[in-house]
């Protein structure tokens, strides 16, 4: 029973956000540009669905001569579903603000800080960058509920990545470690803790002449042994996921993005499917 609860809590309240596949995480853009986006995504596992509407803001800045960016994501989520555990019916019904995410990344090599006019002559070769993300436990959470859209714990996620340009192609490789604090108000007055999850992801991105792009995505992650009051439960995670992302520019300021991914292998049977769409608007930086 406890393993079942931990599995659902972890995959639907934590894993989807922490292990998101993100193409073009390390790329260059003109200094001073702002991006605002809104979107909707749905993760499903068995009879359970987590639908998330999110708004985000990103700003590009000069980081010691290289470009950097800072992003804030505000998600709102609805968790629904019904399942069986023996003769017991397990209902999921939770809705509200999910945990906000803040992320900063700095390019260390190959992405000079350029204004809009200078950027028109920029040609990418090799970019190397670093990032740090954190999830803030402000989401809807009740220790009396089995499942929640908030995790009631922090995570921080340092990462490193590289992007190599070959003609119209971009080949990316990135790695990260997701480190969790404990949830001291888990169901029944228990304490839930988890070891770090280590992940790597890779992308092959093709750019079309109109700047639309299509990415084939893959990620592998492992670790994340869970503990209930210090006792190991649930087993160590090991997962492969594959997906695709397509971005299309409507005009110089607006674009849409469609994405999807699916679990190809899961050591502990905690795979899920994810689909979503978002709209992005950009301004500033002399546009």
For each predicted feature, which ranges?
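Outer-membrane beta-barrel biogenesis signature
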Residues: 17-39, 110-124, 284-287
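Outer-membrane beta-barrel channels and translocator barrels
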Residues: 31, 43, 62-66, 109-111, ...
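Residues on the lipid-exposed face of transmembrane beta-strands in outer-membrane beta-barrel proteins
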Residues: 38-40, 55-59, 102-108, 132, ...
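Outer-membrane pore/translocation modules
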Residues: 78-193, 235
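Outer membrane beta-barrel transmembrane domains
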Residues: 190-287
């Amino acid at each position: 029973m406890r393993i079942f609860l931990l599995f659902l809590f972890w995959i639907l309240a934590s894993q989807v956000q922490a292990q998101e596949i993100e193409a073009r995480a390390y790329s260059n853009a003109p200094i001073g540009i702002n991006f605002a986006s809104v979107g909707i995504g749905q993760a499903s596992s068995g009879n359970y669905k987590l639908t998330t509407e999110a708004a985000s803001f990103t700003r590009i800045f000069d980081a010691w001569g290289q470009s950097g960016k800072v992003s804030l994501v505000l998600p709102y989520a609805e968790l629904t579903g019904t399942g069986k555990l023996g003769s017991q019916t397990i209902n999921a019904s939770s809705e509200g603000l999910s945990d906000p995410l803040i992320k900063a990344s700095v390019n260390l090599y190959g992405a000079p800080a350029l204004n809009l006019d200078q950027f028109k002559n920029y040609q990418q070769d090799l970019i190397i960058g670093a990032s740090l993300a954190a999830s803030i436990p402000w989401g809807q959470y009740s220790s009396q509920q089995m499942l929640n859209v908030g995790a009631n714990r922090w995570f921080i996620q340092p990462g490193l990545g590289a992007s190599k340009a070959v003609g119209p192609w971009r080949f990316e490789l990135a790695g990260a470690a997701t480190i969790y604090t404990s949830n001291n108000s888990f169901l029944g007055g228990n304490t839930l803790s988890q070891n770090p999850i280590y992940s790597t992801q890779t992308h092959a991105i093709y750019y079309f002449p109109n700047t639309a792009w299509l990415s084939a995505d893959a990620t592998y992650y492992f670790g994340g042994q869970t503990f209930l009051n210090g006792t190991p439960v649930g087993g160590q995670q090991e997962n492969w996921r594959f997906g695709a992302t397509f971005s299309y520019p409507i005009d110089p300021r607006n674009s849409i993005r469609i994405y999807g991914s699916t679990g190809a292998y899961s050591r502990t049977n905690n795979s899920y499917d994810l689909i979503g769409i978002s709209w992005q608007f950009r301004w500033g930086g002399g546009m």
